[in-house]
Amino acid sequence: METLDLSRRGVLLNDEQLGPYPLEKLKRVERLTVDIVEDSPRVDEKEMAFAKCRLGGFGDVLKKRMEDFTVRVPIGASYYHFQKYLNDYPENEVAPEKAPLPEDTRIVTRHIKKMAYFTGAEMVGVCEVPRDVYYATKVDGTPVERVYRYAVVFLVRTQLPTIAASHGDEWLDDTVAYQAYQRLACMSNTLADYIRRLGWPARSDAFNNYVTIMPRLVALAGLGEFSRLGIVVNPFMGAAFKAAAVLTDLPLVPDGPIDFGLQNYCSVCKICAEQCPMHAISTGEQEEYRGYMLWRTDERRCVAHGAANPHGCTCGRCAKVCPFTRSEEH
């Protein structure tokens, strides 16, 4: 009996939309839409704003406030603690024999994306991971020595009805963030476990367990562009999303960055800067920051408000008022 060539019939490889958002309609470009200094050095995780604040880099008062950061509200604390246990879940070993996967890496890539959507992801992209995207060391000083070639990056929407009911910088913002982080930790650990069972190394890269600078992965995987907010904005979700990834050596096909005109848009739209309670968002031009040409955010002002916020903790006013976020509020 003749073997049915499923890939030729378009069952395993086709152009059908995988998730709820039409990513195939986006304009793909060869490079990110911001200029990059190619030889930018790897940075230590302790240099990230919230880690620096927790370690006392912004003073003892803010360091003290960080002791109960994210756990001041019962529901936020519940999400935070369970998400932490997911990160600490022991990894299974990589299977000693590799599964007989198709030789066409496009088929494998599409399958892995489908699995990511199956776990609950709302948007998925793939990229190669430059070495400078990996941290040099973790917060505790442990070197990040193991690097992987590819990243499967996925996003989930933060809950829009809750964001719409919030003014952006009270306890609700923290809760919707950790609700998303918990889901992402479950998804990324599940997908990494699955890939290891196929015989390929893989690890979850989720909040509180990152070894990469996640916004860069999101942009490289074609899931957004760098914005005036200082974070990545997605053309469908705006800034109301959270991200995680699975890092792996399983050969995959990268998607490539996107260009939906955000650099021009952000150059004239300054709503986020106008609405920022601490005036931490730049109203000026882009400048070099850690090897990238970006709109600089005053990290100390931003984190200080989040850590010492009398209404809760963290702040998401900029993400709430971004026009790309608000487009789906109703």
What do these predicted regions represent?
Residues 1-124, 147-148, 320, 324, ...:
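Iron-sulfur (Fe-S) cluster-binding modules
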Residues 113-114, 118-329:
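Catalytic cores of enzyme domains
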